[in-house]
């Protein structure tokens, strides 16, 4: 069980600032909204009640980690100090918590909802929410506003509301998305332009929001597994691996070595699959049609392996609590061993046809620069963070599976531009092949599934587990009250930090470069919207 330190809201901002400056807690790993219910006279002294937030912090300098929580018993006008001035990652995460729970973050410059319509009534993640009563079916479009509100605390203890302008009437604003092939999903960017130069950008999420975290609260633990494949659908193995590990950790279940080997191999095949698709989509975004077909051709080989063993190509439903659903198909190992030298031998053609192309280099080099400090502050992990010089690989920071038994290099570039983000992923394909090669001939015998009770009840407590997804750290925060359903199940999206940084990355760039920058960030919209 995870130890979480409680801090009163009045002291939260000062304590968080101290942790950032004195303890070097520069990485806000996760921020989770909570509803712990109404306070009761019979509650034990250590029981937290009310609406609140759980923060997971990490120091990129010392590796130290800490979890903090705070809460307020005011359910009518819940207020907590914002930490968005300390960590940029808190910007979108606090908007998500406001959307879900109605907690207003004092000092946050943009208190709009993140996923739901701004005219939505109520807050769906509250335990007392009644959606049928509050929200009749609407047949009209949501109005778009160019202003937002900020609530500040005055020295005398009173609150002051001010209006912040997103775009004024003199600005030339264009919409890119939500129905645009280059946004890689239903993502909407409102972009203010001066000629072809981007002045600022407003990202609008929620067009494919399905309420997955809310649905989890009414599902048994085995039922929750199916929804992880629908988040980042290009990282289904990795997503479900994280959730299974979190539940197994909470229940004290140790899976067999065979299962660990299988899960690790599947995760790395998934990474290659995702990076090949990344290559193809980026090439298409820049008009390189020939390169587009290279990635799709070779990715099909991996999807065929998945289909033969797992039964699915994108939605695999393979990992399960205590193991995997089925053993490896007899053809799996021979096909993998054939694929490794094939891709190694042909990857130079990818570079010949696209990487070395003068147009591709001009569109990517020196464009869309994200500094290391901003990457950490926004929480941009994965290839984006490592392209900016931040060694943030979960497989190295917090080894899981059998990553502690293999030798692999963490790919890190320092330029922070679109080309560096591209090269990180291309180099990671080779490292994933190396990892698989070290494991494929050494898979031990053993059970593929531990014996489980018919009804799974996770011990009471709070738990956090993470894996290195294809786009960065995918985390799972679970709070259990000992029931057969989770009290709270929150996913740390790999894509939300990426899209929150788009405004910072794109300012001063050309409008055409927005497409290339989005392609190299490699976000998946259903993972953001959940």
Swiss-Prot record:
Region (NADH dehydrogenase I subunit D): 171-530
Record's keyword terms, sorted: Cell inner membrane, Cell membrane, Membrane, Multifunctional enzyme, NAD, Quinone, Translocase, Transport
UniProt membrane topology term: Peripheral membrane protein
One Pfam family of this chain: Complex1_49kDa
EC number(s) stated in the UniProt entry for this protein: 7.1.1.-
Name of this chain's protein: NADH-quinone oxidoreductase subunit C/D
Protein's job: NDH-1 shuttles electrons from NADH, via FMN and iron-sulfur (Fe-S) centers, to quinones in the respiratory chain. The immediate electron acceptor for the enzyme in this species is believed to be a menaquinone. Couples the redox reaction to proton translocation (for every two electrons transferred, four hydrogen ions are translocated across the cytoplasmic membrane), and thus conserves the redox energy in a proton gradient.
Presence of the UniProt keyword Kinase in the record: no
One of the record's GO cellular component terms: plasma membrane
Stored InterPro entries: NADH_Q_OxRdtase_suD (IPR001135), NADH_quin_OxRdtase_su_C/D-like (IPR037232), NADH_UbQ_OxRdtase_30kDa_su (IPR001268), NADH_UbQ_OxRdtase_CS (IPR020396), NDH-1_subunit_CD (IPR026662), NDH1_su_D/H (IPR022885), NiFe-Hase_large (IPR029014)
HAMAP family in the cross-refs: NDH1_NuoCD_2, NDH1_NuoD
Lineage of the organism: Bacteria, Pseudomonadati, Bacteroidota, Bacteroidia, Bacteroidales
Region (NADH dehydrogenase I subunit C) location: 1-144
Protein's cellular compartments: Cell inner membrane
GO molecular-function term, one example from the UniProt record: NADH:ubiquinone reductase (non-electrogenic) activity
EC primary class: translocase
Family membership: In the N-terminal section; belongs to the complex I 30 kDa subunit family. In the C-terminal section; belongs to the complex I 49 kDa subunit family.
Organism: Bacteroides fragilis (strain ATCC 25285 / DSM 2151 / CCUG 4856 / JCM 11019 / LMG 10263 / NCTC 9343 / Onslow / VPI 2553 / EN-2)
Name of the gene: nuoC
Catalysed conversion reaction: a quinone + NADH + 5 H(+)(in) = a quinol + NAD(+) + 4 H(+)(out)
Subunit structure: NDH-1 is composed of 13 different subunits. Subunits NuoB, CD, E, F, and G constitute the peripheral sector of the complex.
């Amino acid at each position: 069980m995870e130890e979480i330190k409680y801090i009163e809201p009045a002291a939260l901002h000062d304590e968080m600032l101290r942790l950032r400056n004195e303890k070097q807690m520069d990485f806000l790993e996760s921020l989770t909204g909570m509803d712990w219910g109404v306070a009761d006279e019979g509650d034990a002294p250590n029981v937290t009640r009310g609406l609140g937030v759980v923060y997971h912090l990490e120091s990129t300098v010392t590796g130290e980690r800490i979890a903090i929580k705070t809460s307020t018993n005011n359910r009518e006008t819940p207020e907590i100090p914002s930490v968005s001035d300390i960590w940029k990652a808190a910007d979108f995460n606090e908007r998500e918590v406001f959307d879900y729970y109605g907690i207003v973050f004092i000092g946050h410059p943009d208190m709009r909802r993140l996923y739901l319509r701004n005219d939505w009534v109520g807050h769906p993640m509250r335990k007392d929410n009644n959606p049928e009563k509050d929200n009749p079916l609407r047949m009209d479009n949501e109005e778009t506003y160019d202003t937002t509100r900020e609530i500040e605390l005055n020295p005398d203890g009173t609150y002051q509301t001010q209006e912040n302008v997103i775009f004024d009437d003199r600005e030339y604003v264009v919409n890119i998305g939500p129905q645009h092939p280059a946004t890689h999903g239903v993502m909407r960017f409102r972009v203010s332009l001066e000629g072809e130069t981007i002045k600022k950008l407003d990202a609008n999420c929620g067009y494919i929001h399905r309420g997955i975290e809310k649905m989890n609260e009414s599902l048994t633990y085995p039922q929750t597994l199916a929804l992880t494949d629908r988040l980042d659908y290009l990282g289904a193995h990795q997503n479900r691996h994280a959730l299974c590990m979190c539940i197994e950790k909470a229940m004290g279940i140790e899976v067999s070595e065979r299962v660990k080997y299988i899960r690790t191999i599947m995760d790395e095949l998934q990474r290659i699959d995702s990076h090949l698709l990344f290559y193809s989509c980026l090439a298409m975004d820049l008009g390189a049609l020939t390169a587009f077909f290279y990635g799709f051709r070779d990715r099909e080989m991996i999807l065929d392996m998945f289909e033969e063993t797992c039964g699915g190509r994108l939605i695999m439903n393979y990992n399960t609590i205590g193991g995997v659903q089925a053993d490896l198909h007899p053809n799996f190992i021979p096909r993998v061993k054939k694929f490794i030298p094939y891709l190694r031998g042909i990857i130079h053609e990818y570079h010949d046809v696209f990487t070395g192309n003068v147009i591709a280099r001009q569109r990517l080099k020196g464009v869309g620069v994200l500094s290391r400090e901003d990457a950490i502050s926004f929480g941009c992990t994965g290839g984006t963070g490592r392209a900016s010089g931040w060694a943030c690989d979960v497989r190295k920071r917090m080894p899981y599976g059998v990553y502690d038994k293999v030798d692999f290099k963490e790919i890190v570039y320092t330029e922070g531009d679109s080309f560096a983000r591209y090269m990180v992923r291309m180099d990671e394909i080779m490292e994933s092949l190396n990892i698989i090669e070290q494991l494929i001939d050494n898979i031990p015998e053993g059970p593929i599934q531990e014996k489980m009770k018919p009804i799974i009840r996770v011990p009471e407590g709070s738990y956090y587990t993470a894996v290195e997804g294809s786009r960065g750290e995918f985390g799972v925060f679970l709070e259990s009250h000992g029931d057969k359903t989770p009290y709270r199940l929150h996913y740390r999206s790999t894509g939300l930090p990426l899209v929150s940084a788009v405004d910072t990355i794109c300012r001063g760039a050309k409008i055409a470069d927005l497409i290339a920058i989005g392609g190299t960030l490699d976000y998946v919209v259903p993972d953001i919207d959940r």
